[in-house]
UniProtKB/Swiss-Prot annotation:
Collagen VI acts as a cell-binding protein. It comes from Homo sapiens (Human). Glycans are attached at residues 140, 327, 630, 785, 897, 954. The gene is COL6A2. This is Collagen alpha-2(VI) chain. Residues 1-20 form the signal peptide.
Amino acid sequence: MLQGTCSVLLLWGILGAIQAQQQEVISPDTTERNNNCPEKTDCPIHVYFVLDTSESVTMQSPTDILLFHMKQFVPQFISQLQNEFYLDQVALSWRYGGLHFSDQVEVFSPPGSDRASFIKNLQGISSFRRGTFTDCALANMTEQIRQDRSKGTVHFAVVITDGHVTGSPCGGIKLQAERAREEGIRLFAVAPNQNLKEQGLRDIASTPHELYRNDYATMLPDSTEIDQDTINRIIKVMKHEAYGECYKVSCLEIPGPSGPKGYRGQKGAKGNMGEPGEPGQKGRQGDPGIEGPIGFPGPKGVPGFKGEKGEFGADGRKGAPGLAGKNGTDGQKGKLGRIGPPGCKGDPGNRGPDGYPGEAGSPGERGDQGGKGDPGRPGRRGPPGEIGAKGSKGYQGNSGAPGSPGVKGAKGGPGPRGPKGEPGRRGDPGTKGSPGSDGPKGEKGDPGPEGPRGLAGEVGNKGAKGDRGLPGPRGPQGALGEPGKQGSRGDPGDAGPRGDSGQPGPKGDPGRPGFSYPGPRGAPGEKGEPGPRGPEGGRGDFGLKGEPGRKGEKGEPADPGPPGEPGPRGPRGVPGPEGEPGPPGDPGLTECDVMTYVRETCGCCDCEKRCGALDVVFVIDSSESIGYTNFTLEKNFVINVVNRLGAIAKDPKSETGTRVGVVQYSHEGTFEAIQLDDERIDSLSSFKEAVKNLEWIAGGTWTPSALKFAYDRLIKESRRQKTRVFAVVITDGRHDPRDDDLNLRALCDRDVTVTAIGIGDMFHEKHESENLYSIACDKPQQVRNMTLFSDLVAEKFIDDMEDVLCPDPQIVCPDLPCQTELSVAQCTQRPVDIVFLLDGSERLGEQNFHKARRFVEQVARRLTLARRDDDPLNARVALLQFGGPGEQQVAFPLSHNLTAIHEALETTQYLNSFSHVGAGVVHAINAIVRSPRGGARRHAELSFVFLTDGVTGNDSLHESAHSMRKQNVVPTVLALGSDVDMDVLTTLSLGDRAAVFHEKDYDSLAQPGFFDRFIRWIC
């Protein structure tokens, strides 16, 4: 016992001496290592700001308020970007650059500018207030950074925009953002206000969007304060990403002196079974087999299905009358032919031979045999050891020479807890640690009792032979296991190298003899892989001859045979007696019929509406804030009003008649006009075509200059004597502050009657009434206020404008006994989406349902359908049958496929239910118009055609009318039958009685006159 105690004390003294020697050597060596470490890693960061100063941003009320907030947001942002040592490992330094854009780009600070010059240049920019070409701004930014690129610089870009674009001349946002990311630029997308397009911002931002988009905004919602949280979050991401780019572990890679040779380690445990090897190379192609015998003929095929009946051909043209033939002689009556005997019935055919049996599959390869486990029984679990205190990880010191034994110091207490550090980047994988020292010898455990033998499992069914599988993917690395229990004495290791002769130690106590018993049974090996496919089997024997087949079914009747040849001409017969007088003939054409044909042929007998000598100039806003859909409604308003003014002067230079001109405007230099004296505008149809060809400019808003342009270029240069001049101005009342406000009265005091129409813009910003009063020459009665652009085309407002422009019209009709309708211009191709809403109530009836279904198909065949779903021209058609509140049936969505429309109509069933048209309208908008697949096109005119008598439930009727106005729906109502509810029909037509076609029954749908009138109306 005394000898064991002396051994422990001697070992302790030796270890203490070694530790003291190491501490003496570590101190100067650590100082030398710190002196050899390089300085903190330099990490230059360039931040580029891209500011949107287009009209959709800067014209928000009040003007340039969002640009003012940008000029506050950016300096506050960069004031928090200080040069610093981040995590005491990288030295961050900041430089800046920036540009602002609209439909043009201006670089106000090149990349690499310092803070003072950048802020000075930022405060000097002014907004463009025109269109939005974001892709060109991103392309310009990328080129600027590429030219100024320096090695080791981290680039970030902060793009402040609302996501709206008016054009993509540089390839689109996605393309340019991807090119910027390829250049190593990380893009943050920040919204200047709440009127944003989120998808556009996500197209700009780098991924993941949780870092580079994350609802960043310059201002707090419903406030004018800078969003400090956005600044903090973006800066945090910038620093962390820059740290990951710049930080390199270099000081920790200094090699130390080699340590002493270690003891030979214990023999390792048996390793696990290795991963399956990769499949071997594909074997060479086998030799071609011998040619097989010719097979027996196959059985006779069954007769094909009878073909569908073809469609009726088009009516042929009426042939010219032939010359009168000579009187023929009566021929002799021929003899009747004999009826031939029936043919013999054929014998049934023999049953064909059976097919060859399938080839047998090849046997699979034998799987690998699992390794046999070591036998043995598990010992009893030893007592758990005490948990030692976890020490802090120290630096690996250099191995020193053995020193004299030192005095053991007292055990130090735990140090204070350090501050929580910022989360660092993921560390590089460390080097593999050296083998640990042997643990203390554990006590020998008593042998445990042998466990009972388990029950035998049931014999499973033999599995099917599977194909050879590919090796599975490598499994994830298992979690770090818990520290093991105190182990038993290991096997003796191999003899190590002979060491230096040491001092003779005391004699040790003899150990107890160890137990020898088998270990636990090893785990079963993994299941072997299936073997390869076996060789193909030989050809099977011929099967037995089959029994005779059943008697065939009776065939279909054959087509009649060809007609026989005519017999020879017989002798002339005796003249017959005089015949009786025939039935009375059809009545001749009436004067009305003749005049109808004349009017349909030449159109020279129509009534004309004359407003006297009248000049009308429409000034319409074509700026970015209006939006494409609202601009289209402006053009439709102009066409609808001019339709009410009657015929246009055939000679624009004559002193009488109506002339119409149009000015569409955006920013300076973009004005376009249809002149009053344009010789090409000599009819209503030519004027409509010119208006439809006007394209949305999508720039700034220079209303005062546009009014001056309208007077100087249209009214002043072509004014006629004794002619009333009207001007209709459509705008939201706001304009670019750089434009001269004095020109708002450019049409006043010039004998011009001005009507100013103020409507909210695409962002639902209210118009400014003060500017509207200036445009209308301070006459409040000539100012019209509206909320939605769809109110422009309402029937009531069109009537009001007709009364303003032509208060005392003169209707001149030819003296004809028959009346006719006003001529309508032919249908022209443009994008139209037509949704038919068919009343499926019990009042309709099965027969009328089929007539309505045929009418929808005829309309689809008559219209020029689109070539694809995103075709910018032509029409698409949809059908919804509505019944009770929960009984709406979409027969087919908006489609351009005539075959699909025909098949859907054939399978549509009559509902025979109640009628709630309000629920039908809401369902049509949600399920057809707003459908993510095949919904209404963005720039197409949306038309709802109702087939109903108006006798329906009034639930949500007015709400559905409001929904149609919000969707800019153009309604048409086909009121069929004598018992109709005009109040409901007027509500469905949004107050436009001209859009209600009242016919006596559903048979009228097939009348050519009604059908042509309907087609011209919806076009």
